[in-house]
Amino acid sequence: MLSIKDLHVSVEDKAILRGLSLDVHPGEVHAIMGPNGSGKSTLSATLAGREDYEVTGGTVEFKGKDLLALSPEDRAGEGIFMAFQYPVEIPGVSNQFFLQTALNAVRSYRGQETLDRFDFQDLMEEKIALLKMPEDLLTRSVNVGFSGGEKKRNDILQMAVLEPELCILDESDSGLDIDALKVVADGVNSLRDGKRSFIIVTHYQRILDYIKPDYVHVLYQGRIVKSGDFTLVKQLEEQGYGWLTEQQ
C-alpha cells in the first residue's frame, strides 16, 4: 500500500529525514516513536503534502502511484487521511457542511456520484450511532470551542465518513486526559477492518496500551533505527530511548 524508500526531507535547508524507509501493507497498524526532534511530525507532514517540507531524495509510493507528485487534495482522494496534533478551527462552518463537502470532493475525485443532503444525513446518522457520538457535534462549527476530547471525536468522525485507506495520526494523544485518550483509541479500533491501515505517530507509550500496533518503529535523527512488535513499546517504557541512541 505505502512504500517509502530512502526518504530525505529538509525544512528551511535543514535536513530532518535522512534516509527513512518504511513499508505499510493493508490492514496494518504501525506506531512511529522517538525522542523530540527525531523527525516524527516531519514524516507525517511530508505524507500529507505540506509545501514547506522539501523532499531532497528518495521515493514514496501509495498504491503504486508517486505520492510526492500528488497535491494534498489528490492524496485525500486517493485515500489518505491526516489527523493533526492541533486540529484547525473553522468558525461559521458546521461540521455537517464541512463533512458533506469533503466527502463529495473525494467521491468526485473517484468518479463516484455525490450525495445529496438526504443521503448524507442518512450516512451521518449511521456513523454517529456506530461511534456512539453526540448528534449535536454536527451542528457546531468545526472544532470551535471544542475540548481536546471533542476535537479527537471529530477526527474519528471524519475518518469514519471519508473511509480512507490510510490514516495518519500525528501525536493525536498529546495533552489528552485518559478519557479523551480512550476516545481516540476506541475510534481507531472501531475502524480497524483488516484493510484500512494506520500510522500512529506518538511520543508516549500510553495510547499504544489501547491501540495494539502490529509494528513499532523508533525514529532517531531522521532514520528508523529499530523496529519490532508491541514488546518494543514495553522495552522503551522501561528503558527510555538512551540505549538505542547510544548505539548510533
UniProtKB/Swiss-Prot annotation:
Residues 2-246 form the ABC transporter domain. The keyword Nucleotide-binding applies. It comes from the Bacteria. Keywords: ATP-binding, Cytoplasm, Nucleotide-binding, Transport. One of its GO terms (biological process) is iron-sulfur cluster assembly. PROSITE patterns: ABC_TRANSPORTER_1, ABC_TRANSPORTER_2. Disulfide bonds: none annotated. It is found in: Cytoplasm. It holds the Pfam family ABC_tran. ATP binds at G34, P35, N36, G37, S38, G39, K40, S41. Signal peptide: none annotated. Has low ATPase activity. The SufBCD complex acts synergistically with SufE to stimulate the cysteine desulfurase activity of SufS. The SufBCD complex contributes to the assembly or repair of oxygen-labile iron-sulfur clusters under oxidative stress. May facilitate iron uptake from extracellular iron chelators under iron limitation. PANTHER family: ABC TRANSPORTER I FAMILY MEMBER 6, CHLOROPLASTIC (PTHR43204:SF1). Part of the SufBCD complex that contains SufB, SufC and SufD. Interacts directly with SufB and SufD. Interacts with SufA. Belongs to the ABC transporter superfamily. Ycf16 family. This is Probable ATP-dependent transporter SufC.
